[in-house]
Amino acid sequence: MKKIQIAIDGPASSGKSTVAKIIARNLGLIYLDTGAMYRVATLVALQEKTEDASKIIQFIENHPISFANGKNGQEVLVGLDNVTEVIRTNEVTNAVSKISAMMEIREFMVAEQQRIAQKGGIIMDGRDIGTVVLPQANLKIFLVASVDERAERRYKENLSKGIPTDLDRLKVEIAERDRKDSTRAVSPLKQAEDAILLDSTGKTIKEIVQFIEEKAKKLM
């Protein structure tokens, strides 16, 4: 069986991570949560009260990012600290575009991601996987959905975690995040020329997973 690389890109809350995790489990692939890596960098920036990219990188080099399978799914570690939940707070979410747009941060993270992906048998999701991180990926998907639907998804997700959230404010924040991600100077959110455009509006997770898995199995 061929060890393929699958890249899933798309805007915030389009379902990338959920879909990628399920496909990884179903097809026996490694799931590399690139978004979580940038959220870690943002968390470090907030906790250390710095926007100095070199200091953020140095902290992460001293406390490496790793992923582990926990009882409730994949866990994100920074050194020995479990940051799975804290990197998903609104404070981190609203600051991640700014930190992830820093050239030095992106170059550091991309190098780390490419190193891990070299062996193949991997699925990654993010904003620039198909265009920058894994331009040679065997299968590229660009997953989109309406702002309203994405806000509803994030709203329900936050409620299930006990995080109080205002739906209308979420819609504004997601639309603004789209604008920032699409217009930033470094690696903007962009569909790769050879990526398959998949609109998930009105579709179930099961339908999206099935579509991508059918494409992937033909390449394995």
Swiss-Prot record:
UniProt subcellular location: Cytoplasm
Annotated InterPro entries: Cytidylate_kin, Cytidylate_kinase_dom, P-loop_NTPase
E.C. numbers: 2.7.4.25
GO biological process: nucleobase-containing small molecule interconversion; pyrimidine nucleotide metabolic process
Catalytic reaction annotation: CMP + ATP = CDP + ADP; dCMP + ATP = dCDP + ADP
Membrane-spanning residues: none
One Pfam family in the UniProt entry: Cytidylate_kin
Binding site for ATP: G10, P11, A12, S13, S14, G15, K16, S17, T18
One Gene Ontology molecular-function label: dCMP kinase activity
Family stated for the protein in its record: Belongs to the cytidylate kinase family. Type 1 subfamily.
HAMAP family hit by this protein: Cytidyl_kinase_type1
Entry-linked NCBIfam families: cmk (TIGR00017)
Name of the protein described by the UniProt record: Cytidylate kinase
Source organism per UniProt: Lactococcus lactis subsp. cremoris (strain MG1363)
